């Protein structure tokens, strides 16, 4: 099983919408740039029928160096989370196990 890349997304836009390759690539880049900007501005990104991107603050917590066993604090940080929407979940579940 492979991964869908931005280049492949642009290629599909080129093939299915008739955009030229440069326009398709720019559209994909702009889409992800808008998501990045919204998250940088502390905004939630809601894509109807797909899911939500959120920012979550994680507190500092104790961790361990796996080689030495030494306790090391894991610093507080902000992470991006994605919660799939109900429609996306339902479509993925409908196709689960149908492809090898």
From Swiss-Prot:
Keywords: DNA recombination, DNA-binding, Transcription, Transcription regulation, Translation regulation
SUPFAM superfamilies reported for this sequence: IHF-like DNA-binding proteins
InterPro entries: Hist_DNA-bd (IPR000119), Histone-like_DNA-bd_CS (IPR020816), IHF-like_DNA-bd_dom_sf (IPR010992), IHF_alpha (IPR005684)
One GO biological process term: positive regulation of metabolic process
GO molecular function: DNA binding; structural constituent of chromatin
Region ranges (Disordered): 54-73
GO cellular component: cytosol
Family stated for the protein in its record: Belongs to the bacterial histone-like protein family.
Assembly mode: Heterodimer of an alpha and a beta chain.
Function: This protein is one of the two subunits of integration host factor, a specific DNA-binding protein that functions in genetic recombination as well as in transcriptional and translational control.
Protein name: Integration host factor subunit alpha
Species this chain originates from: Pseudomonas syringae pv. tomato (strain ATCC BAA-871 / DC3000)
